[in-house]
Each structure stands twice: as C-alpha cells, then as structure tokens.
Curated annotation (Swiss-Prot):
CDD domains: NAD_bind_Glutamyl_tRNA_reduct
Site (Important for activity): residue numbering on this chain: 135
Entry protein name: Glutamyl-tRNA reductase
NCBIfam families with a match to the protein in the record: hemA (TIGR01035)
Native source species: Psychrobacter cryohalolentis (strain ATCC BAA-1226 / DSM 17306 / VKM B-2378 / K5)
One Pfam family of this chain: GlutR_N
Annotated domain remarks: Possesses an unusual extended V-shaped dimeric structure with each monomer consisting of three distinct domains arranged along a curved 'spinal' alpha-helix. The N-terminal catalytic domain specifically recognizes the glutamate moiety of the substrate. The second domain is the NADPH-binding domain, and the third C-terminal domain is responsible for dimerization.
Catalytic activity as recorded in UniProt: (S)-4-amino-5-oxopentanoate + tRNA(Glu) + NADP(+) = L-glutamyl-tRNA(Glu) + NADPH + H(+)
Binding site for substrate: 47-50, 145, 150-152, 156
Pathway the protein contributes to: Porphyrin-containing compound metabolism; protoporphyrin-IX biosynthesis; 5-aminolevulinate from L-glutamyl-tRNA(Glu): step 1/2
Binding site for NADP(+): 225-230
Known role: Catalyzes the NADPH-dependent reduction of glutamyl-tRNA(Glu) to glutamate 1-semialdehyde (GSA).
Underlying gene: hemA
Keywords, alphabetical: NADP, Oxidoreductase, Porphyrin biosynthesis
Quaternary context: Homodimer.
C-alpha cells in the first residue's frame, strides 16, 4: 500500500514539543507543497494534541543524491538499499525503500520546524501499510483521542483533507484511501457506542436538555453569567435549536460578546442585567448558571414564583458554579430538574466507563474494517496491474504484427511462411514469462506457486 504515517501526539510527546512541531496558518500549505517533491500525495493533521503526516511514498529507489544532506542516517540508509539490491530480495527491498522515504520525511520535518532530527526522533511514531491504515482509522473514530470517542477529530481530519485537495497534494490513490477511512470511521461510530455518551460538562448539559425537551425551537434558554464555562454550555445548548436565549450578566460587554456568538436568524437573543433575573426566570425553560458569586442567585422562593407564573411548566436548571448559584432545596420542587456540577461529573464518569467498554467493540470492528479495506485496495491495485499487463501485451503483439506486415510487402514474400513465423513469435513471446516463472518455482521447490501457475494456465486453455 506504501501508506505511512509519521507524527507525535499527546501520548508520545510533551506539550512543549507538540507546540514546536505544530503547523499553523500558511505552514500547512507550504509543507504540503514541499512534501509533493518526495511523496505521491500527503495529508497533514495538526491539532493541539497531534501533528501527523499521512503520505503515500513512491515505489522508486532513493539515490544518494535525492536523500536530504547533512544526515549520517541517510548515508547508512543508502548503503542498506544497495545491499538489498544486491541480495535481490524484493520484499526486503520494498521495505527498505519505504524506510528511506520515512527517514527523508522525518529529516524534512525537523528542518522545516528548525529542529534537529535527534531532538524529535525519540518522540515520533511511524506506521506503514495496513498499520498506518489502522492508525488513521483509529484516529478518525476518536479511539486515539485524549477524550475517548470525541467527534471533533473527524472534522479536523476532513479540514486537513480539504487543505490537501486545495494544494493539489491529494493524489487519486490517497483520495481513495481517505474515502475508505471516512466511511469506516462512520461505521465505527454508528455501530458501536464509543461516542454515544457525553464526557464533558457542556456535552452532558446539552444531553440533559434533549432528554427533557423535544420541541426546542419553542424553548427559552436563560444563561446566568457569561464566563467561559457557561459560554461553552450555552453554545452547545443553543446549537440544538433553542429558539430564544436570554443572557443575564453583571458585565454588559461580556454579555453582548456572547450574544454575538449565539446570534442566528432563527434565534432571538436578549441581554438583561442580573437585577432582572427574578423577572426573566419565569420565561426560562432551561437555566444554565455559573457566576462565581459567593451568594445564592436563585433561591427556592424565587423559583416557586417563577413556576407559578409559567403555570408549572417543567424547568431544567443546570448549576455549574462552585459555590452554588442555585439553592440546593430547589431540587425538592416538583416540575424542577436541578443538576449540580457534581451531578454532571457523576454522569460523565459513568459515561467514560461506558465508552471504555464500547471501545473494545470498536477496536474489533476497526481490525475487521482494515482487513476489508486492504482487500479492496488489493483488488483495485490488481485491476491496474492487469490493465498495464494487457497494454504491454498489446504493444508487443502489435510490434510483431507490424513487422510481419512489412515482410508481406517484400518482393519475395511468402505469406504462409510469414504467418507461421508470426504465430511462432507470438507463442514464444506470450509463454516466455509463465515458463520462466514455472522453472524458477521448480528450482526453488515452491510447489504451491508451481501448482498455482500450472492450474491457471490449464484453466486459460480450457476457457479458449
């Protein structure tokens, strides 16, 4: 397959090195352009937790002149290639060629980021062929993420692929592999529970909303305080399709900034002061609060008044603050569902364990899917090999035919002799390769190969 992946992630390298190896902004497009000089297509995935180069390496042998300079390892690699060529061992030679390409990409990456190979090599991991395919699928499915099963990585890979397409760095063959990886990752997520449960506070809060309310466009979300945690929660809940959002905050500028983030043609956004909280509480179906205040902002009395005003329609209250913003006694009120940060953490802990259990099934499915993808790749590759074989055969036959036609135009041409000679040459030409292969198999005692070739030739004769 000649697919390789070279990279670092949160498991292999400290954040200080990951920062130095991260490719940001125009670096990705520049890197993709440079990689085209020694790869048959590449994709670069660079996030806060990983920098990875996925590349198809060429089949050609690297000469000493094409290896990067100033690398003692490159000189060693060249000598290994030469010894493999002498040994005439095709399997070892192919492996050595891939190793040489891997070394070149490593050396290039170090130079591109103005680091030495010795600095980064201990932290780099390398996978090749089906192992590279397995790694790519595990990454795309969220099985290699810091948060097991998280879905963002698939979107990040898709953006990386689009960047490669824009830079003309995605070859047809690599594009085919990418399509296979995306389809397989979708199956892993659909057929296992590895990403089904929320494992962050914001996702857990959003999950609660969908469990209690199903007509979200008609619901109102009240955001009490516009800090970072509440911003994440509000973003996730609003993204579910909530039709109206009210933001109460001491600092009007921060409230307006959050309002700008959440603004949507299908969503009403209102900014209020904290002093208006008792009045707007009655309008809220969902409340998310995280103020950092030392005092209770929503007590039992205020909640009872709000419920009465809304004719006791259910309310979901999410209190992410420590100390609490919402009095714990509110949980005793009928029609109010109150969840504290501890409640959500408990839910998350259970969900993480469920994801770990689901990951076992996901890993088994990944192994199965990689086998299927590799078989499809081999079938696809054999199709190309067959086409090339037929093209070469046609060229050889046509060459012999043209020579015979030229002889027919001679003054002393005997058509019968020319036709006999043509058939002899065609027979010799077409049987040379299988005859040579059978003799080689017999000499080496490879009875399995010998039986395969003989059986194939006999089938060919029966079919004609």
């Amino acid at each position: 397959m000649r697919l390789v992946v070279i990279g670092v992630n949160h498991k292999t390298a400290p954040v200080a090195l990951r920062e130095r190896l991260a490719l940001v902004g125009d670096e990705v497009s520049i890197a993709l352009a440079q990689l085209q000089g020694f790869s048959d297509g590449s994709v670069i995935v660079s996030t806060c937790n990983r920098t990875e180069i996925y590349a198809l390496v060429p089949e050609s042998i690297l000469s000493p002149h094409t290896l990067l300079p100033n690398s003692a390892s490159a000189v060693v690699e060249t000598s290994v290639i030469e010894s493999s060529m002498t040994a005439n061992n095709s399997a070892n030679l192919s492996s050595t060629i891939i190793s040489a390409h891997i070394l070149k990409i490593k050396t290039w990456l170090a130079g591109f980021k103005q680091l030495s190979l010795d600095e980064i090599d201990p932290y780099l991991y390398v996978h090749r062929n089906t192992h590279a395919l397995t790694h790519w699928l595990r990454v795309a499915a969220g099985l290699d993420s810091m948060i097991l099963g998280e879905p963002q990585i698939l979107g990040q890979i898709k953006r990386a692929v689009h960047m490669a397409q824009d830079q003309k760095a995605l070859s047809n063959q690599l594009g085919w592999i990418v399509d296979q990886v995306f389809a397989a990752a979708k199956r892993v997520r659909n057929e296992t529970q590895v990403g089904a449960q929320a494992v962050s506070l914001s996702y857990a809060a959003a999950k609660l909303v969908t469990q209690i309310f199903d007509d979200l466009p008609s619901r109102t979300l009240l955001v009490v305080a516009a800090g970072e945690m509440n911003r994440l929660v509000a973003t996730h809940i609003a993204g579910l399709g909530v039709g109206r959002v009210i933001i109460c905050n001491r600092n009007p500028e921060r409230a307006e900034a959050l309002a700008a983030e959440l603004r949507n043609p299908n969503r009403r956004i209102e900014v209020r002061t904290l002093q208006e909280l008792p009045q707007v509480l009655a309008e809220a179906d969902i409340v998310s609060s995280c103020s950092g205040s030392m005092d209770i902002l929503i007590d039992k009395t205020m909640t009872l008044r709000a419920l009465k005003s809304r004719r006791y329609q259910p309310m979901l209250m999410i209190d992410l603050a420590v100390p609490r913003d919402i009095d714990s006694t509110v949980s005793r009120i009928d029609d109010v569902y109150l969840y504290s940060v501890d409640d959500l953490q408990h839910v998350i802990a259970g969900n993480i364990e469920q994801r770990r259990q689901a990951a076992v099934d996901a890993e088994l499915l990944v192994s199965q899917l990689v086998v299927e993808m590799d078989r499809r790749f081999q079938v696809r590759q054999v199709g190309k090999d067959i086409q090339q074989y037929r093209t070469r055969t046609h060229e050889q036959v046509n060459k012999l035919l043209q020579a015979s036609i030229a002889e027919l135009h001679g003054d002393s041409a005997n058509p019968e002799d020319i036709m006999i000679e043509l058939t002899r040459r065609l027979t010799q030409n077409l049987t040379h390769a299988p005859s040579k292969l059978m003799r080689k198999a017999a000499r080496e005692g490879d009875n399995e190969l010998l039986d395969f070739v003989v059986s194939g030739l006999q089938d060919a004769h029966r079919n004609h």
